Regions:
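Short N-proximal segments of mature Sec-exported proteins
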Residues: 92-105
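Surface-exposed patches in mature extracellular/periplasmic domains of secreted proteins
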Residues: 41-44, 84-93
Length: 159
């Protein structure tokens, strides 16, 4: 099963009483992101919903409903899954990480070199946990809450 396959429940009530590990991987990723991001407010500009960065020409605002924010998150995460689809079963984990840090920090560009994680995966080496946890910094400082998030992502999504 493709871990990036989005499964939409008939209602949010259907998911409420289930263990997170009984949920499909995509739903686990959504829940994890929502838990750590929370709904953004005007102080979080240019981010809305659950961490969507407003792009030029987009007209999102902070009055969006939780359902609209959820839909936007799922759309963004699916787009990132497509970007990392060549990494197969690791595509959802990479998409989830890039949702927060941006895909260029993994894929590389003029400012960043290709991440060690992707270099290892390209060679078939899936021993990426320690490299994944290195993405626990903000403004050059190690942030314990970000490390907890990374550990949670690994536990929920690394197969």
């Amino acid at each position: 099963m493709n871990p990036c396959h989005a499964v939409h429940p008939n209602s949010h009530q259907e998911w409420r009483n289930l263990s997170i590990f009984s949920l499909p991987p995509f739903e686990r990723a959504v829940r994890c992101i929502k838990y750590y991001e929370q709904l953004h407010t005007p102080e979080n500009h240019p981010y809305v919903g659950y961490g969507h960065r407003i792009q030029p020409g987009e007209k999102y605002n902070y009055s969006m409903s939780e359902l609209q924010a959820d839909s936007l998150l799922r759309s963004d995460l699916l787009r990132l899954c497509v970007l990392f689809r060549d990494f197969g079963r690791d595509s959802l984990l990479l998409a989830t990480l890039s949702y927060q840090i941006g895909p260029s920090k993994l894929l590389g560009n003029a400012k960043y070199s290709k991440s060690i994680i992707l270099q290892k995966l390209d060679k078939g080496d899936r021993n990426i946990e320690s490299d994944y946890l290195k993405f626990s910094h903000w403004n050059g400082k190690h942030i314990p809450s970000i490390r907890r998030r990374r550990m949670t992502e690994l536990r929920l999504l690394l197969e």
